[in-house]
């Protein structure tokens, strides 16, 4: 029972790390990458659809992206979604592909992205702490119901703290790397 609780907590913490990685990947740096477009939704025949499902991405140069829609009829909607996104890009359309040239990041914009990254990191830390709190409540319930002794649960709580610290450190490392990536000119 205790092992199940710890295993479940660790799995949820791993998922929180994966979400944080995805969030950090979506934050724009000076270089183009497909993850920047991860959260952009396109109004495709009246239904909000992720851009990844409607087009393929090519990155011919560090600051340019070619987006090739699978359905040419969706091209104008994809362009509109890109213009309305918070990426700050102006897509160009040549009839077959949508071409995006990413502008250089200004110092002010870099600082804004760092603030966003810190907010995402804090959200991930809160998520980890919530998982820890729920697991601790479950361990307390196990002791209260007499399913395990206090010593056994005490060891499990120490293990839970170690796992939580490991995952918080991983979030901090992701944030540090993202900040370094954003500050690199």
Curated annotation (Swiss-Prot):
A biological-process GO annotation: translational termination
Keyword rRNA-binding among UniProt keywords: no
GO CC term, one of those recorded: cytoplasm
Domain of life: Bacteria
Listed transmembrane segments: none
GO terms, molecular function: ribosomal large subunit binding
Location of the protein in the cell: Cytoplasm
A Pfam family recorded for this sequence: RRF
Matching CDD domains: RRF (cd00520)
Keyword Protein biosynthesis part of the UniProt annotation: yes
Keywords associated with the record: Cytoplasm, Protein biosynthesis
Function text: Responsible for the release of ribosomes from messenger RNA at the termination of protein biosynthesis. May increase the efficiency of translation by recycling ribosomes from one round of translation to another.
Family membership: Belongs to the RRF family.
Alphabetical list of PANTHER family matching this protein: MITOCHONDRIAL RIBOSOME RECYCLING FACTOR PSEUDO 1 (PTHR20982:SF3), RIBOSOME RECYCLING FACTOR (PTHR20982)
Name of protein: Ribosome-recycling factor
Lineage of the species this protein comes from: Bacteria, Bacillati, Actinomycetota, Actinomycetes, Kineosporiales
